[in-house]
Curated annotation (Swiss-Prot):
Tissue specificity comment: Expressed in epidermal and cortex cells of roots. Expressed in stipules.
GO BP annotations listed: proline transport
Keyword Transmembrane helix annotated: yes
Function recorded in the entry: Proline transporter that mediates proline and glycine betaine transport. May be involved in the uptake of compatible solutes from the soil into the roots, or in retrieval of apoplastic amino acids delivered to the roots via the phloem. May be involved in delivery of proline to wounding sites. When expressed in a heterologous system (yeast), imports D- and L-proline, glycine betaine and GABA across the plasma membrane. Has the same affinity for D- and L-proline.
Gene Ontology cellular component annotations, sorted alphabetically: plasma membrane
Name of the protein in question: Proline transporter 2
GO terms of molecular function: L-proline transmembrane transporter activity
Subcellular location: Cell membrane
Keywords assigned: Amino-acid transport, Cell membrane, Membrane, Transmembrane, Transmembrane helix, Transport
Organism: Arabidopsis thaliana
Length: 439
């Protein structure tokens, strides 16, 4: 028995042999690394980028925000490469995050990982619905000031559109041309936000960059912003995305990750820094609410943000859709009547619940903080480092082992602190605003 076989036998405990990993009803191993890179870049430059000036830079200031974003980029790339390198660990492909965790740890961690991932993706999708609703409301107030339509109404409309799109696109690889559309939409709202913010910044030289609030409030908002930093760069579904890439899967995924964390982050950096430079501590959590300019330009940007949020939600909901399709044995043509009806009921119900929660508590920054705290930190940093430590234990030096344990402990503490801060933020906002608030 060679070292590799011994390691695999050591990792796969007896409990794991009772774990049945289902085949997938979705398409895998069909996409180029470049298409996968666009999926990742779509996630990082989704309409969420319009919130980072207000949810990251305002609480952290110039030094904390710039250094934090650069560090978050580096550590996120590192953590994602760890996960990507384990995709074929043990001589088989692990097309789901929970499959990889189950193979390494056993049945209990399979379930825990699926629970963490489900919460992560569910909350991200709630955020996309809030974003889409906010974008629609922003268009409405450009032309009407009667206040007849409130944010919850627009969130409901966004939910319906997201459900229709989910029914029409059967799986992640089927996005195809929609990824190109998403890129064009992202370019539109990012360019508009940058140009209008820069114009406002030039015309309004006086602004305040001081971090606002009391000492205790600053502590909680800074901690929450740290969770927003890691939320910005991580999908929480890397193995599911990697499952779509052609062989060689590790090499191609590494290309996609390097693209995401170099070329892909530049638009996000630009809109985040310029937005904060223009408006300082008064920057809105949805940047397009701060900009001034021609009505038709702002309407175009908001409509683009709305449509891009619909596409992005489908990406982050795909693991849940894959689970439902596989569990209930969906087979045959995606256009078959029974499959259309199944997607209508299953995906429609999922979107309906997400939409209800989004309308109930439409606090975008709080959602980002809580998601980063309770799921992004554990999935992307704690679990990734510990899985790599367990899987590659015999090949790591003492220094490397200590490094991974340091990451596990540090991000564990960060996750706990950020969760406390996020819950406090939600509690404060819930007192200041009623449910179904028009924020």
């Amino acid at each position: 028995m060679d070292t590799s076989e011994a390691r695999n036998r050591k990792v796969v405990a007896v409990e794991q042999f009772d774990l049945e990993v289902p085949e997938t009803a979705h398409q895998i191993s069909s996409d180029s690394w470049f298409q996968v890179a666009f999926v990742l870049t779509t996630g990082i430059n989704s309409a969420y980028v319009l919130g980072y000036s207000g949810t990251v830079m305002v609480p952290l200031g110039w030094i904390g925000g710039v250094v934090g974003l650069i560090l978050a980029t580096a550590i996120s790339l590192y953590a994602n490469t760890l996960i990507a390198k384990l995709h074929e660990f043990g001589g088989k492909r692990h097309i789901r995050y929970r499959d990889l965790a189950g193979f390494i740890y056993g049945k209990k961690m399979y379930r825990v990982t699926w629970g963490l991932q489900y919460v992560n993706l569910f909350m991200i999708n709630c955020g996309f619905i809030i974003l889409a609703g906010s974008a629609l409301k922003a268009v409405y107030v450009l032309f009407r000031d009667d206040s007849l339509m409130k944010l919850p109404h627009f969130i409901a409309i966004a939910g319906v559109v997201c459900a229709i799109f989910a029914i029409g696109i059967p799986h992640l690889s089927a996005l195809g041309i929609w990824l190109g559309v998403s890129t064009i939409l992202s370019i539109i709202y990012i360019i508009v936000a940058i140009v209008l913010s820069a114009k406002d910044g030039v015309n309004k030289p006086e602004r305040d960059y001081n971090i606002q609030g009391s000492s205790i409030n600053k502590l909680f908002t800074i901690t929450g912003a740290a969770a927003n930093l890691v939320f910005a760069f991580n999908t929480g579904m890397l193995p599911e995305i990697q499952a779509t890439v052609k062989q060689p899967v590790v090499k191609n995924m590494m290309k996609a990750l390097y693209f995401q964390f170099t070329v892909g982050v530049l638009p996000m950096y630009a809109v985040t820094f310029i937005g904060y430079w223009a408006y300082g501590s008064s920057t809105s959590t949805y940047l397009l609410n701060s900009v001034s300019g021609p009505v038709w330009v702002k309407a175009l940007a908001n409509i683009s943000a709305f449509l891009q949020s619909v596409i992005s939600l489908h990406i982050f909901a795909s693991p849940t859709y894959e689970y439902m399709d596989t569990k209930y044995g969906v087979k045959g043509s995606p256009l078959a009547m029974k499959n259309l009806l199944f997607r209508t009921v299953a995906r429609g119900s999922y979107i309906a619940v997400s939409t209800l929660l989004s309308a109930l508590l439409p606090f975008l920054g709080d959602f980002m903080s809580l998601t980063g705290a309770i799921s992004t930190f554990p999935l992307t940093f704690i679990l990734a480092n510990h899985m790599y430590l367990v899987a590659m234990n015999d090949e790591l030096s003492l220094v490397q082992k200590l490094w991974h344990w340091l990451n596990v402990c540090f991000f564990g503490l960060m996750s706990l602190a950020a969760a406390i801060a996020a819950v406090r933020l939600i509690s404060v906002d819930s007192k200041n605003f009623h449910v179904f608030a028009d924020v």
